[in-house]
């Protein structure tokens, strides 16, 4: 191991290590350590304060990490009445789900989020860590409650109603983002959801534009999409469903039809987004961006449950982009990841591995996918 690699190893183990400590461990002078650090900084291998290393393989996911509760009705839902259900609890949150999915696809994923100093927060972080996600930048806030998401699904697995308690994400301030920026900027790709406050989203987009950092945005919902600034230059790709896309385009969903797909996508692109993916559920996906326009038909799927399918779609596209695929090529990874997830009752499908993704896509390409 050469000197530069020795120094990088020590810095990765402890970003706050002093030059004197490194010199003592390696057995060279402090001035020699300083010289190596200067060279590494010039190369861009380390950057920012605390010797943050530049990891060209990491995806930094910023946003929600919740405790998810799902109640699935055993029969047709009756309003104003007691309905028999089965209840499950799991880790959730859009950013967290995307990070875990990427980890399952053999990508290096990191999560920047906030949780409360409660059992839910402790459990969410520990479970996320166990599943291969770097949660070292997650912040535990004293006196706060971890975000919760409660969904009611009908007997077919379709969402009927959901409740969200996300007040804790108001604490994800621009100041917090600045404090964590060296770690954010060191990633190869940044993915954020709109659980972040409007001012934090605006600063994130501006900084990614200024520093030419690739940024994906998941709008989460049409209401939360309103938090995005009008100027979206700095957003590399965005992934709205139809309702969210109409909101971003400033057009009421009720006034739109299939003939408006190109118009809606064009209006979003006019705000500065380079690649737009509009998910249409059973109608597939519309792509519009620097690579042209295309409609991707849906993959025939026996749907068990829809929760998490959108997060898997974003993760699949990120997987493709990280492996140098075009955005159109990456859309097939996204559709395949969603296809696999829809066939499970998990928000993050344990079956969704890199091998399964590649094999399923190969079968689909050959036209012999039997699922």
List PLM regions with ranges.
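Short gly/ser/thr-rich secondary-structure transition/capping motifs
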Residues: 42-45, 170-175, 217-223
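Conserved phosphate-binding/catalytic region of the ribokinase-like
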Residues: 1-19, 25-54, 256-371
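Conserved phosphate/ATP/ADP-binding segment of small-molecule kinases
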Residues: 205, 209-293
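Glycine-rich phosphate/adenosyl-contacting loop at the front of the ribokinase-like
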Residues: 3, 7-12, 17-25, 29-112, ...
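Structural motif
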Residues: 58-59, 69, 188-189, 237, ...
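Glycine- and other small-residue-rich loops at beta-strand/loop junctions that grip anionic moieties
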Residues: 26, 113, 192-194, 217
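Conserved N-terminal subdomain of the carbohydrate kinase-like
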Residues: 55-56, 78-85, 104-188, 358-371
């Amino acid at each position: 191991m050469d000197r530069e690699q020795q120094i990088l190893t020590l810095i990765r183990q402890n970003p706050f290590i002093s030059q004197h400590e490194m010199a003592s461990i390696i057995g060279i002078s402090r001035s020699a350590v300083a010289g190596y650090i200067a060279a590494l900084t010039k190369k861009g291998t380390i950057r920012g304060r605390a010797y943050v290393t530049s990891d060209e393989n990491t995806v930094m996911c910023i946003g929600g990490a919740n405790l998810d509760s799902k109640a699935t009705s055993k029969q047709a839902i009756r309003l104003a009445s007691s309905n028999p259900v089965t209840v499950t609890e799991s880790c959730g949150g859009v950013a967290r789900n995307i990070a875990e999915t990427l980890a399952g696809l053999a990508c290096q994923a990191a999560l920047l989020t906030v949780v409360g100093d409660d059992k839910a927060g402790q459990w969410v972080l520990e479970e996320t860590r166990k599943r291969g996600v770097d949660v070292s930048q997650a912040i535990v806030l004293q006196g706060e409650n971890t975000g919760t998401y409660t969904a009611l699904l009908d007997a077919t697995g379709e969402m009927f109603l959901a409740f969200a308690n996300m007040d804790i994400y108001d604490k994800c301030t621009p100041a917090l983002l600045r404090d964590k920026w060296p770690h954010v900027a060191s990633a190869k790709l940044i993915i954020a959801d709109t659980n972040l406050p409007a001012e934090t989203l605006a600063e994130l987009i501006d900084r990614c534009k200024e520093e030419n950092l690739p940024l994906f945005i998941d709008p989460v919902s049409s209401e939360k999409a309103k938090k995005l600034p009008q100027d979206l230059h700095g957003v590399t790709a965005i992934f709205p469903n139809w309702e969210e896309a109409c909101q971003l385009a400033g057009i009421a969903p009720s006034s739109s039809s299939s003939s408006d797909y190109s118009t809606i996508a064009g209006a979003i692109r006019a705000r500065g987004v380079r690649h737009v993916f509009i998910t249409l559920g059973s109608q597939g996906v519309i792509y519009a961006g620097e690579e042209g326009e295309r409609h991707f038909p849906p993959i025939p799927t026996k749907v068990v449950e829809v929760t998490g399918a959108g997060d898997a779609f974003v993760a699949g596209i990120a997987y493709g982009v990280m492996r140098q695929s075009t955005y159109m090529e990456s859309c097939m990874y996204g559709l395949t990841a969603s296809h696999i997830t829809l066939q499970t009752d998990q928000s993050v499908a344990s079956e969704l591995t890199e091998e399964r993704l590649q094999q399923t896509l190969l079968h689909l390409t050959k036209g012999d996918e039997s699922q």
